């Protein structure tokens, strides 16, 4: 735990941001100068320098040798990221973050980013119907909202001209932004000529960065949904699939049931049946030597359970998860899909959760769920098209967190050198800008401002799972409740006044009926005093 705490303290000195190609930098000027240091509107200076939020700094990349899996050099824009595009970016101070240091780093809030707040990711099966529907509506909003801050590149850096005279960037909706990012980080390398590609390359899978990269990726996704919805209490839920016999979330109330007429499609009763996928035609891109440009390519596909049973006999079990967590070594041997007794390789799904040994022809753990879904989620590059991807990877991240808490590893266990390209400790994560180093995120999720409901102690879990949602709803309608309370008090006061006045008048009439008649006379002072007293009380 000490080492995790130290990592959390050190993290504040590293620069942060939210995603790929900030809009202010995606132009000829940015490409020509190779500088991405946008102005912060709060003080009108690049990176908020006048307010001490950050400054524009040279990018220094690691020159540690990579593994033998990728023998090429200088032909892929992702090599030595982000130097093909930019060599100067914002470096944010303290708890500040964002591409111009105008936001806060993960877990911190407020105008000065001084407030630490821990958000809780919950089991989607434990959420109320209203909460589930809100989550689905947020995803659909993200699918239909152009992201205001980020764009994607539709061409390689070489295609844009030596001085960036032909920039190739495009708008994209917020959901598909993350589909495209997942495609871009895992795509093949173009070697020149139709179909001539290098396939044994992936900057986010099949080695050490798999877990840290996806952790940062989910945090970005979470943050962007908060921004477009204005709901800063939003968290990505998880699906605890241990021991499941089927796709429990594949219902029309959740992530979409099976279409009765075509089992490969989503039920028309689900909003996801209208979704179009992007970045799924890998071979076509390779043959054209072109990047995915986010053009719609057809409906979302899913046919859970109708996969090759020899490749995935079953959904992973509790025993599989516990064995995986018990493995003490994060990375071993060749540090790729052939590594034995590697926690990362077993959890990713290239090794057995019973023996720890690498297996061929089978997919386990993380990979097993992708294959089991038997559709858009089953190919690496386009897998994020299926919203179940979010639920699945949130649970994978929670298993990573359990391993960190169980073994409390020092930072030094993360491979510094000879991992496959993109996976060494000092390598910046592709394609995030400004920059995140892989090894900086081998640390507890508490340092990043979030927790998982099932990892809380029972008391905290009760508060988060049952009490907090109601308190959040009350907070959202407190102004209405206050107004209703004031109106109710006013009505009660008026009613009370009417009742007192009626009673006073009745008593006065009764006294007049009982009093003997001695002719006309002035009212008694006492009677006048009673009237004044009642009036006073009524007024009070």
From Swiss-Prot:
InterPro entries the record matches: Di-copper_centre_dom_sf, LE_dom, Tyrosinase/Hemocyanin, Tyrosinase_Cu-bd
EC number: 1.14.18.1
Stored Pfam families: Tyrosinase
Keywords: Copper, Glycoprotein, Melanin biosynthesis, Membrane, Metal-binding, Monooxygenase, Oxidoreductase, Signal, Transmembrane, Transmembrane helix
Renumbered residue ranges of the record's region Disordered: 511-540
Cofactor(s) named in the record: Cu(2+)
Compositionally biased residues, Low complexity: 527-540
Residues carrying sugar: 87, 233, 293, 340, 374
Main location: membrane
Binding-site residues for Cu cation A, renumbered to this chain: 182, 205, 214
GO cellular component term of the entry, any: melanosome membrane
Membrane topology per record: Single-pass type I membrane protein
GO molecular function: metal ion binding; tyrosinase activity
Keyword Membrane applies: yes
Role: This is a copper-containing oxidase that functions in the formation of pigments such as melanins and other polyphenolic compounds.
Sequence similarity: Belongs to the tyrosinase family.
Name of this chain's protein: Tyrosinase
Name of the gene: tyr
């Amino acid at each position: 735990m000490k080492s995790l705490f130290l990592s959390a303290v050190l993290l504040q000195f590293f620069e942060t941001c939210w995603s790929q190609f900030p809009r202010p930098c995606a132009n000829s000027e940015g490409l020509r100068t190779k500088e991405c240091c946008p102005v912060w509107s709060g003080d009108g200076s690049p990176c908020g320098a006048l307010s001490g939020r950050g400054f524009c700094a040279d990018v220094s990349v690691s020159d540690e040798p990579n593994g033998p899996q990728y023998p090429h050099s200088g032909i892929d824009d992702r090599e030595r990221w982000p130097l093909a595009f930019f060599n100067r970016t914002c470096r944010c101070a303290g708890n500040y973050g964002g591409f111009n240091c105008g936001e806060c780093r993960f877990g911190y809030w407020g105008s000065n980013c001084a407030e630490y707040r821990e958000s809780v990711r919950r089991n989607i099966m434990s959420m109320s119907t209203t909460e589930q529907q809100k989550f689905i509506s947020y995803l659909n909003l993200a699918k239909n909202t152009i992201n205001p801050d980020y764009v994607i590149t539709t061409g390689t850096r070489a295609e844009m001209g030596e001085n960036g005279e032909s920039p190739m960037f495009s708008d994209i909706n917020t959901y598909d932004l993350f589909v495209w990012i997942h495609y871009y980080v895992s795509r093949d390398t173009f070697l020149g000529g139709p179909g001539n590609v290098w396939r044994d390359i992936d900057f986010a899978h099949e080695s050490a960065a798999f877990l840290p990269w996806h952790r940062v990726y989910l945090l970005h996704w979470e943050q962007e949904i908060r921004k477009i919805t204005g709901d800063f209490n939003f968290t990505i839920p998880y699906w605890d699939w241990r021991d499941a016999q089927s796709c429990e979330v594949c219902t029309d109330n959740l992530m979409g049931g099976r279409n009765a007429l075509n089992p490969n499609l989503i039920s028309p009763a689900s909003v996801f049946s209208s979704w179009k996928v992007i970045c799924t035609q890998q071979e076509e891109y390779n043959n054209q030597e072109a990047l995915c440009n986010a053009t719609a390519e057809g409906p979302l596909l899913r046919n859970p359970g109708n996969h090759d049973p020899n490749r995935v006999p079953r959904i992973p079990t509790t025993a599989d998860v516990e064995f995986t967590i018990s493995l003490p070594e994060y990375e071993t041997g060749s540090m790729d899909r052939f590594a034995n007794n590697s926690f990362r390789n077993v959890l990713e799904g290239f090794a057995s959760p019973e023996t720890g040994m690498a297996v061929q022809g089978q997919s386990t753990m993380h990979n097993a769920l992708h294959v089991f879904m038997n559709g858009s989620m089953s190919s690496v590059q386009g897998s994020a098209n299926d919203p179940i991807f979010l639920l699945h990877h949130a649970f994978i991240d929670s298993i990573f967190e359990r391993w960190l808490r169980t073994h409390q590893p020092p930072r030094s266990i993360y491979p510094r050198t000879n991992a496959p390209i993109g996976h060494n400790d000092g390598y910046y994560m592709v394609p995030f800008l400004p920059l995140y180093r892989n090894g900086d995120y081998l640390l507890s999720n508490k340092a990043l401002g979030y927790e998982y409901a099932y990892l809380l102690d029972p008391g905290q879990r009760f508060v988060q799972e049952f009490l907090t949602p109601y308190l959040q709803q009350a907070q959202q309608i407190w102004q209405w409740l206050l107004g209703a309370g004031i109106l109710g008090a006013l009505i009660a006061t008026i009613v009370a006044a009417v009742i007192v006045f009626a009673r006073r008048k009745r008593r006065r009439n009764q006294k007049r009926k009982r009093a003997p008649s001695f002719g006309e006379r002035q009212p008694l002072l006492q009677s006048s005093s009673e009237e004044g007293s009642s009036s006073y009380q009524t007024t009070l």
